[in-house]
Amino acid sequence: MGCLQGKVAIVTGASTGMGQAIAIAMAAEGATLGLVARSAGPLEEAGSAARTEGGEVLTFPGDVADNELAKRVVRTMIERFGRIDFLVNNAGTNTPHRNLADMSVADWNQVFSTNITGAFLFTRHVLPHMRMAGKGQIINISSGAGLAPSAPAGVAYSASKHALHSLNDSINLEERRHGIRACVIAPGETDTPNLDLRPRPPAKEELAKMLRSEDIANAVIYVASQPDHVSVDMIVITPTAPRNYQADYERYVAEGHTRVSLD
């Protein structure tokens, strides 16, 4: 019997990369899942992969920053399964334009909408049900860019992930009295499809040195499997072999690819 047998979880950003790996790992441990992502086709593929591990999986295509979607997902999971034990706020995006001078208002808003507003909305809607149960876990997938500004990750992404760390701390500050725990997981460079959005995507030999999505999924299982009296507040995961990814960014700037435009 898996360590999450009988538990119910919502995972956002579940169609690819870390989110898909998290969904499959939680399903393998017995969890019933509600998966959320923008792209319906890849989301259904991820749902099918999770179903092969056993257990029931519902999929909800849509934008995590849509308040009505967040309400519908939570309502449906409660109506079908009667509980929500875990929320994994994994949905994240970035823009190819990383500098302040390069970034449009639309770029900024899109990154914050997905990376922090979505986490806020889903957290807001699961809280009443977790409070009623007297327990629950919210796991926020951040980044090393949430610990220190990262030029390769960009100003909007770094700022949004710092905000996610603050949201995590606020959840713990306000909700532990209700038995609700929050953990933020901050991975270093991880081989996911989001790397294709970098101004200079890493080469294959560089990808080989990075973390895998399954590494982050294993950390989620570790956090989710802790007893109710244990709170893991933060996990930082880094590749054993550090890579000079700052050099990618410096070459990109030196080649004159920044656009420096204002709305």
What are these regions (language model features)?
Residues R98-L100, D107-N109:
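Substrate-binding pocket helix/loop in short-chain dehydrogenase/reductase
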Residues V184-I185, R200-Y245, E250:
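C-terminal helical subdomain
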Residues T123, S160:
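Active-site helix of classical SDR
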Residues V8, S15-T16:
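Conserved glycine-rich cofactor-binding loop
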Residues S143:
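Residue(s) in the substrate-gating loop at a strand-loop-helix junction
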Residues G41, P61-V73, V105:
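The beta1-alpha1 cofactor-binding region of Rossmann-like NAD(H)/NADP(H)-dependent oxidoreductases
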Residues E29-A46:
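Conserved glycine-rich Rossmann-like NAD(P)H-binding loop of the short-chain dehydrogenase/reductase
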